[in-house]
Amino acid sequence: AAGNEVVARISPDYPANENGCWQTLSAYQGPADCVIDFSHHSATGALLEYCLARRLPLLIATTGQTEQERHQIEAAAAVIPVFFASNYSLGIAVLTDLARRAAAMFPDADIEIVEMHHNQKQDVPSGTALTLANSIASVRPDAKFVIGRHENGKRTQKQIGIHSLRLGNLPGIHEIHIATGSEVLTLRHEAKDRSLFADGAMQAARFLVGKPAGLYTMQNLIHEENAQ
């Protein structure tokens, strides 16, 4: 993005330490303002160690973290600024906010989430679907997540159903269906191009640099944008 410079790219698949490419993060000791990770949640520990040692802001763009990894992220955020989001689309950030508001306005409605991704995606349900569900649950403290439906029986009002489809090369589609006895509200977001996630991450990185230690999300970003 304009006004930004990638000073190092880290991947074990790159040629060893050539042309700004490095095979390991620890091998790079040059200047940087922020670290952005789009790799895999298993790299979380090493990323946190590196950023803590150098007091660098860290932007995490992976999903599927274990409970231990989440605890590590929270502990690191007491020392450095950490931006942690399951999805860096600004549209998804708005959808998350709308989902919470709609759930609060229709407290007795049935709510189901449907997410669709490419057939190579490994985690089920998507991290974004869980973020949406948690946003809804923030105004429904007794909510119960149902991942798919594998048993016979009536649906209870407390349930939030989450359903996953894996098809072709879809970048990502998320739908929230909110149904009362007399109407249905459907909120939908569709990613047309994966570049939007990189654009959103760069915007989040600019937001993060200069912030005090803390754990930041896309909601912090959009609320700051709205306040300006």
Predicted regions and their residues:
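Short acidic/histidine-rich motifs immediately flanking catalytic phosphotransfer sites
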Residues: 28-36, 53-58
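Short glycine-/small-residue-rich Rossmann-like dinucleotide-binding loops
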Residues: 39-40, 63, 164-166
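Rossmann-fold NAD(P)-binding glycine/threonine-rich loop
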Residues: 42-54, 61-84, 90-93, 97-102
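Short, surface-exposed loop/turn motifs that are enriched in glycine and acidic residues
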Residues: 84-92, 118-125
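Short, acidic/small-residue loops that bind anionic groups at enzyme active sites
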Residues: 60-62, 84-86, 111-113, 117
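C-terminal substrate-binding/catalytic lobe of Rossmann-fold NAD(P)-dependent oxidoreductases
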Residues: 1-28, 32, 107-228
